[in-house]
Amino acid sequence: MAIDLLSTFIKPMHREGTKFVAIFAVVTLVLFLIWEPLGWIGVGLTVWCYYFFRDPVRVTPTREGLIVSPADGVVSLIEPAVPPAELGMGPAPMTRVSVFMNVFDCHVNRAPIGGTVTAVAYRPGKFLNASLDKASEDNERNALAIRLADGRQIAVVQIAGLVARRILCEVREGTPLLTGERFGMIRFGSRLDVYLPEGVQPLVCLGQVMTSGETVLADLASPEARRTGAAR
């Protein structure tokens, strides 16, 4: 029972966090030598750093055609928008679903659906609050185009935020991805935009809490109209 309880709190850590946790741990040892109360503050910060870089296992639905959330967080925007020009996906608007991650969310990013990466495009930019509408256009971003088995395309865009200053993308053009597979992360608060294929409606609502790799964001085969919801 004790082991089960520990597993609830202790999660695997993304390798990107190893150096940061090591630095925090060394600084903590120095703080203990200077003054013990400072050392305990360092312990708390080290634990927080480990928690930030956690990379928990997720149970991804495997039915063909399901699009899952690429990030933990809250749905902040659902609107028509043209995908980033650097992806070469054309000028036609697509339904964009934005998931905002705060500093307490897990920041590992996952593929919303299986397919082949056809383009990866990084663009430098500003570091505005990622929850703002204009962050999609003005902020630093890294965009991916994924071609599905039926030939349709979906776009996923990692957007840096006010605190987030480091976008990590571990895939390149030609990389095959499975639904829910890890492809990168953004450090310290940010946003993920998903551009859905034409005619596909989101099955999530504004303000809904999302779990990356698990929450179904849309269904390619569903005729259901866009959902609405209310906070209760």
Curated annotation (Swiss-Prot):
Which positions does the site annotation Cleavage (non-hydrolytic) cover?
G189, S190
The entry's active site is S190
Membrane topology reported for the UniProt record: Peripheral membrane protein
- The protein depicted here goes by the name Phosphatidylserine decarboxylase proenzyme
Q: Which organism is it from?
A: Cereibacter sphaeroides (strain ATCC 17023 / DSM 158 / JCM 6121 / CCUG 31486 / LMG 2827 / NBRC 12203 / NCIMB 8253 / ATH 2.4.1.)
Q: Write down which residues bear the modification named Pyruvic acid (Ser).
A: S190
Q: How is it modified after translation?
A: Is synthesized initially as an inactive proenzyme. Formation of the active enzyme involves a self-maturation process in which the active site pyruvoyl group is generated from an internal serine residue via an autocatalytic post-translational modification. Two non-identical subunits are generated from the proenzyme in this reaction, and the pyruvate is formed at the N-terminus of the alpha chain, which is derived from the carboxyl end of the proenzyme.
Q: Which family does it belong to?
A: Belongs to the phosphatidylserine decarboxylase family. PSD-A subfamily.
Gene name, Swiss-Prot/TrEMBL: psd
Give the GO terms filed under biological process for this record: phosphatidylethanolamine biosynthetic process
